[in-house]
Design a protein with these regions (language model features):
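A short glycine-rich beta-alpha junction/loop motif
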Residues: 1-12, 80, 147-153, 185-213
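Sequence-specific dsDNA recognition surfaces
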Residues: 62-78, 92-124
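A short beta-sheet element
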Residues: 1, 90, 115-173, 195
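Non-catalytic DNA-recognition/assembly elements of restriction-modification systems
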Residues: 3-18, 26-72, 201, 206-214, ...
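Short amphipathic alpha-helical coupling segments at ligand-binding clamshell hinges
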Residues: 20, 164-171, 211-214, 218
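Short, solvent-exposed loop/turn positions at domain surfaces
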Residues: 29, 112-113, 188, 227
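Short coil/turn segments at secondary-structure boundaries
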Residues: 57, 74-81, 183-185
């Protein structure tokens, strides 16, 4: 290691590089902070509207969704798709709690996608298998450009009539998250797996429909700001990564 040659630009160039990176980093931090504040706003509103969840009737998750299924993993390229070409989601598409369809891997031309495993608007996707820190993470698909599959390490569910997807998705990602993660089997150092049969029996508090509707309307308004903030984060992160690649690769 001591004999390794390291490229070291001149002092003026080092300062120029530092200025560019220092310009991007605060903007990235601010956008992430804005996203956190919006998430806190939703959490506060949820508690304000629903209060103690134990006051509501509880149903098994399998009685709250019309289906609970795993996806399909196919041989993929190392890069994301172009346009609406067929692709498979990466786990990073849902691990933040916000559905990010750009996190995908393109399918090769000679691999045929499976139509029954395509993501649809209104789906709730939940990480069935992942590291202990990320297993159980979930996100609601508010919009999809189509032609994109979910992998076999993800559960897909769709709420039954009478249950708002926004409400159920929020429950799974927040108040019930620790209960979901507690279902996972596996050691602290290995990939953890949530059995379908155990997830199906998870107790879900069902609030009155009018409250669910009001909460869904509130989240819809906040989501407009969350979408803008997430777009800004993605753009700034791409810029930062490209600068780092240019200067340090």
């Amino acid at each position: 290691l001591g004999q390794q040659m390291v490229f070291l630009p001149g002092l003026a160039e080092q300062k120029a590089i530092a200025r560019q990176l220092d310009f991007v980093e605060p903007q990235l931090d601010n956008a992430k902070e804005q996203l956190d504040q919006l998430e806190s706003l939703i959490k506060s509103r949820f508690v304000e509207m629903f209060g103690d969840l134990s006051q509501y009737e509880s149903r098994d998750l399998c009685d709250c969704v019309s289906s609970l299924e795993t996806g399909k993993s196919l041989k993929c390229q190392a890069f994301r798709r172009m346009g609406s070409a067929p692709a498979v989601l990466k786990l990073s598409a849902i691990s933040s709690g916000i559905y990010r369809e750009a996190e995908n891997k393109a399918l090769p031309d000679d691999v045929k996608p499976v139509s029954t495993k395509m993501v649809c608007e209104g789906d709730i996707l939940l990480a069935r298998k992942n590291t202990p820190e990320l297993v159980g993470r979930s996100a609601l698909v508010g919009h999809t450009d189509g032609n994109i599959m979910f992998p076999d390490i993800v559960f897909r569910m769709h709420p039954c009539e009478g249950i708002y997807g926004v409400y159920l998705a929020y429950l799974l990602a927040n108040p019930l998250f620790e209960s979901v993660r507690a279902l996972a089997h596996g050691s602290a150092k290995s990939m953890s797996n949530i059995p379908k049969s155990e997830l199906a029996r998870l107790g879900v508090p069902i609030a009155p429909l009018e409250l669910q509707c009001a909460f869904a309307g509130f989240v819809s308004q906040v989501d407009k700001s969350r979408f803008i903030a997430q777009q800004q984060i993605d753009k700034l992160q791409t810029l930062y990564d490209s600068l780092a690649q240019e200067y340090f690769a």
